[in-house]
């Protein structure tokens, strides 16, 4: 399989169950080990060995299963939002919860996320609002892919 995505394009993978959509996305994100092939971003070949390396390279993944792979349901919306963005909100091991909440508020407005407060448990949100929180945390990262 080969494909190219240009800056600003929205790219989706479609297919029947078992066709390899999820596996392909997980390979690109570094969640599964790649046996062959290459991933190139901005002309540079990436050798991703983990999701952490993928995130650092500007790659994110909106999972199919937000409940088990996209959110920590027992944690607050703010905490879920902050997880992939700790490098932006933490300093010397302390999280600046005010900055984290302010950044979240921007996305809550833009995506029209319905919640009572940033400290509301992610598990109590509707499915659509949970998915918006997953999207918000990656939008905050300004991911490339």
Model-derived features with residue positions:
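Glycine-rich phosphate-binding loops of nucleotide-dependent enzymes
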Residues: 1-145
């Amino acid at each position: 399989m080969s494909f190219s995505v240009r800056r600003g394009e929205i790219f989706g993978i479609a297919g029947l169950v078992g066709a390899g959509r999820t596996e392909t996305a997980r390979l690109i994100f570094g969640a599964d080990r790649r046996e062959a092939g290459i991933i190139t971003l901005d002309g540079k070949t990436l050798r991703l060995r983990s999701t952490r390396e993928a995130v650092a390279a500007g790659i994110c993944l909106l999972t199919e299963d937000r409940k088990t792979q996209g959110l920590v349901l027992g944690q607050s919306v703010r905490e879920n939002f902050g997880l992939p963005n700790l490098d932006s909100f933490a300093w010397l091991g302390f999280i600046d919860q005010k900055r984290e909440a302010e950044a979240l508020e921007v996305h809550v407005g833009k995506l029209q996320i319905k919640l009572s407060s940033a400290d509301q448990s992610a598990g109590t949100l509707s499915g659509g609002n949970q998915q918006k929180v997953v999207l918000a945390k990656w939008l905050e990262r300004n991911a490339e892919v």
